[in-house]
Amino acid sequence: METLELQGAKLRYHQVGQGPVLIFIPGANGTGNIFLPLAEQLKDHFTVVAVDRRDYGESELTEPLPDSASNPDSDYRVKRDAQDIAELAKSLSDEPVYILGSSSGSIVAMHVLKDYPEVVKKIAFHEPPINTFLPDSTYWKDKNDDIVHQILTEGLEKGMKTFGETLNIAPIDAKMMSQPADTEEGRIEQYKRTMFWSEFEIRQYTHSDITLDDFTKYSDKITLLNGTDSRGSFPQDVNFYINKETGIPIVDIPGGHLGYIQKPEGFADVLLNMWG
């Protein structure tokens, strides 16, 4: 893996291929290796970069998180993630780059576009679970508060079951999300990673400071992506609302919420049709 030294962290990332830079931002998994099957499909067309977000995988913190980062209203980590992606983009290319964020990674991508638009050539938001600008934002914020409380008091299994039911996660995705790692060490790491995401991201990222105006001023750069196998899920409803209010197009893409793993060939074909 490659390394970029940043304030407070060593950011690690996979890099394959040639051509214009395309950065993938992972969601709850946090690690870029989930994009490697997709990267193989795109490496003849793009320099594909798949990031381990700070606090995840091979990326290392060199300074501790501030205590305030676990506050439900803290924007520290999502803003830090966005700054990391912008600094990575600048280190890799003198030109604006392509960016795709998936799930909570798409919320990071929104903050990249909002705060660092100069690094963005084109950007895609794949099924973002953000609620800040929705008419029923308070309802969804309260639901996420309840989910995190349940995880912290009743355990991860019960909380994630509620999470899946509340967001209407498709069966194809629920099955993959609940699949345990192959080794005991892997299962321990998986548990720690999911607990970290629960405490530091479910509430903070989904209710972070993004408005519809943040999209309209850059609408020519944005594509919304909804999976063909995750119809009816909350993240898709978010994209439908953005589309209705701004006119930014939605493109159907193969697979579900984890479509880049489930159907990497078809996922890549859509990206090449968009950006190739």
From Swiss-Prot:
<feature type="domain" description="AB hydrolase-1">
    <location>
        <begin position="20"/>
        <end position="137"/>
    </location>
</feature>
<protein>
    <recommendedName>
        <fullName>Uncharacterized hydrolase SA2367</fullName>
        <ecNumber>3.-.-.-</ecNumber>
    </recommendedName>
</protein>
<dbReference type="InterPro" id="IPR029058">
    <property type="entry name" value="AB_hydrolase_fold"/>
</dbReference>
<keyword id="KW-0378">Hydrolase</keyword>
<comment type="similarity">
    <text>Belongs to the AB hydrolase superfamily.</text>
</comment>
<dbReference type="Pfam" id="PF00561">
    <property type="entry name" value="Abhydrolase_1"/>
</dbReference>
<dbReference type="GO" id="GO:0016787">
    <property type="term" value="F:hydrolase activity"/>
</dbReference>
<feature type="region of interest" description="Disordered">
    <location>
        <begin position="57"/>
        <end position="76"/>
    </location>
</feature>
<dbReference type="GO" id="GO:0016020">
    <property type="term" value="C:membrane"/>
</dbReference>
<dbReference type="InterPro" id="IPR000073">
    <property type="entry name" value="AB_hydrolase_1"/>
</dbReference>
<dbReference type="InterPro" id="IPR050266">
    <property type="entry name" value="AB_hydrolase_sf"/>
</dbReference>
